[in-house]
Regions:
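Pyridoxal 5′-phosphate
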Residues: 1-408
């Protein structure tokens, strides 16, 4: 595995050459990444050349449909799943609400779902609301000091009543990467399906969902350098078991069964630009010329290697500061570069102070109220969150550390 060519990477993102953004280092990537040029090019082309109803007989319509199909096929291949096991919806939260409705119709009285208090609300609230329909909700709780999930605690929650286990690949404030394959195996052994929220993990390298093994995997394309779409993998066995949520005449198309809303044609088509970007990085760094899953895995490891190298010095500089509590582990190899800090004063005010030092970051609860409460964080203060990705430069890291020295 070689070293990431950071200049090549940043050249793929027009934001880095945008005059209005010069001098500002972007550290709110967990809220939405910059968009890569292949996605912008495809979106512009669609809106200028293909803005018609797709799948018709005339050229513009035919090409529109082909580009939508291309996006699904290429992204599914990177994720290691079948093409029709990937659906696009308006957002991850919306996709989860649709799934919860399907489970509500499928489950029987007395059935149970396991949720965590480590999740973003998108993979928590929709499931918890099913208690109103008579289903049992069991909470897999984090350690209040570390924020970690203990596998034995999960095993203690499982029995023949549990139909679904929901958890994050990593939390959007705690950052620790959960062992998806191991957790999935435990849940499957107990007869439960598995739903993984990958929103905070996928920006750091698309996972091989097929190898990981969950029945549902969710992430948001606008955080993975793409357009504003929620990407949802539902493996065939579960997708064909759950009741259809779309128009009745679309029930036979697996990728349509859980997307009742009309598809956003242009943004789905533009999602193929994420696959273009993966291929650009793979080929530029002399990666494998094999199938898309192999190329995706190569780029995943390339991204993670870069991020870990940049993240560890940040964690080292923060972890022993007075009046600063690092949320989650200080080991960069075990977490995503999404770093939340509990401070002695209001985090939004600190984020405002950072603007004066050219740092774009955020403060608040980031829809992760449950994990912050469980860890004893004062919600009136919230947390300061600094988050980055593989395209962040060493110069920007230095700028961040200098700014934190000045404001903390």
């Amino acid at each position: 595995m070689g070293t990431l060519d950071i200049d090549f990477v940043r050249a793929q993102f027009p934001a880095f050459s945008e005059p209005s953004l010069q001098g500002q280092a972007f550290f709110e990537n967990a809220g939405g990444s910059y968009t890569c040029k292949p996605v912008l090019d495809r979106l512009t082309r669609y809106y200028t050349q293909r803005k018609v109803q797709p799948y018709g007989p005339y050229d513009a319509s035919r090409l529109a449909g082909e580009e939508m199909d291309e996006a699904r096929a290429r992204m599914a291949a990177i994720l290691g799943v079948n093409t029709d096991e990937l659906s696009f919806g308006p957002s991850t939260t919306q996709n989860t609400y649709v799934l919860a409705q399907a489970f509500r119709q499928w489950m029987q009285p007395g059935d149970a779902i396991v949720v965590t208090n480590q999740d973003h609300e998108a993979n928590s609230g929709p499931w918890r609301r099913l208690v109103e329909d008579g289903f049992e909700i069991r909470e897999w709780q984090i350690d209040p000091e570390t924020g970690s999930l203990n596998l034995q605690d999960l095993e203690n929650l499982l029995d023949e009543k549990v139909r679904l286990v929901c958890f994050p690949h990593c939390s959007n404030v705690i950052g620790e990467i959960n062992p998806v394959t191991e957790i999935t195996a435990i849940a499957h052994a107990a007869g439960a399906f598995v739903c993984v929220d990958g929103v905070s993990y996928a920006p750091h390298g698309f996972p091989n969902v097929g190898d990981l093994g969950p029945d549902i995997y969710l992430f948001s394309a606008y955080k993975t350098y793409g357009p504003h779409q929620g990407c949802m993998v539902i493996r065939r066995a579960l997708g064909e078991l759950l009741p259809n949520q779309a128009h009745y005449f679309n029930a036979d198309a697996l990728y349509k069964r859980f997307t009742p809303a009309g598809p956003d044609h242009a943004q789905i088509a533009a999602s193929a630009g994420m696959a273009d970007y993966v291929d650009l990085l793979c080929y530029h760094h002399n990666g494998p010329k094999g199938n898309a899953t192999e190329r995706g895995a190569f780029v995943h490891d390339l991204m993670r290697g870069q991020e870990v190298a940049l993240l560890q010095p940040v964690l080292d500089a923060i972890k022993d500061r007075n009046a600063v509590r690092l949320i989650g582990t200080s080991d960069a190899t075990r977490r995503a570069p999404t770093v939340a800090l509990s401070l002695s004063r209001n985090a939004e005010a600190v984020a405002t102070d950072l603007v004066e030092h050219g740092i774009m970051a955020g403060g608040g609860d980031f829809y992760a109220v449950r994990p912050l409460q469980a860890m004893g964080v004062d919600l009136d203060h919230g947390v300061l969150r600094v988050s980055f990705t593989h395209y962040t430069s060493q110069q920007e890291i230095d700028q961040l550390l200098g700014a934190l020295d000045a404001v903390l």
